[in-house]
């Protein structure tokens, strides 16, 4: 039971840019994803671009980690796109649903969907490790390489507390 509790993903909260960077530096090898607002304190003053600067810094260190920018200012969607982040409009009536879906899909909590890298068409879907074991050899090589090299599989395994195989697969990046 203790191991299961330790293996559960944790959410950490930063109130400033500096706190966010300290947390990222401390946990960067175990981060499933980053959710940030656009506007918060940086250098002791509220910076409307603090979250965008955080996205830029994290993306420069990890090209595959899922990023989410949430903002009441829809113009910030451009910055989310620039850094490969999802955007959540804080004014949306379904903000909580949008955020939940993105976290489930991008942070590895939902089903794992293997896609054709050229068409993004679904080629296989697994709900759990047993299903992965049953279909792994039927998944097209190109799809498997695509997902492994972008840390999709390792992130999915991390979210299920399967640390040894996740660590092993995270090191594999084919270009």
Where are these regions (language model features)?
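Nuclease catalytic cores that cleave nucleic-acid phosphodiester bonds
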Residues: 54, 73-83, 165-172
